[in-house]
């Protein structure tokens, strides 16, 4: 029931979206969503917005924060979706550096809610939606405000204690780095090989290697005083998949 606006840096992308003002979803979710407008002007996108959801790789969090901070207004909620690790801390750091005193909530999700790929502008393929994605605010005293703004609108987001937990809950360090390095020969093959990163690239041996790496993440969580599910447990819980289909 909330109006949705989109911000993008590509004028061509924005122009095409504004022609239809729709985004079509396929596979795990079927339907067509309507947007209010798309724009390359971050101030226009943020003006009057209650909830601002930042969906982009973590290497751009700082630069986007610098664009966004001058336009932040009291009462707004920003959710880094996902934050990777320590994204909320980086965002707050930029706010402090730029002298921003706006009373805003900065939240962080440990991972992206959906597994998806764009098919063409305005059309996306949803492979799956996670059953639950933990989120938290920085500072944690804002958790109730974050829950009211985000969890009440999108029930898949569930509140956890703090952004330290969401940062440790980031699985990308295991699932992206190791399989990519161990598939270097496929990636560099000439002629190029067409393979599916997860289904073909994560063999039983690579899966075991990833699980071994994951033990360090679990140990860090334990040392910090909280329980952390293993990467195998997380994937089974998130996608309701059987053990035999989990790397």
Residue ranges and their predicted role:
Residues 93, 113-213:
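Substrate/ligand-engaging "lid" and interaction regions
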Residues 8, 42, 82, 110, ...:
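Residues at the C-termini of beta-strands that transition into short coil/loop
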Residues 206, 212-247:
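Small-residue-rich helix-loop
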Residues 4, 38, 106, 158-161:
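Generic structural signal for residues in well-ordered beta-strands
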Residues 21, 92-96, 221:
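Conserved hydrophobic residues forming the short capping helix/wall of the S-adenosyl-L-methionine
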Residues 29-79:
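Rossmann-like NAD(P)-binding element
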Residues 58-120:
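Rossmann-like NAD(P)(H) cofactor-binding subdomain of soluble oxidoreductases
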Residues 3-49:
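Conserved N-terminal Rossmann-fold NAD(P) cofactor-binding segment
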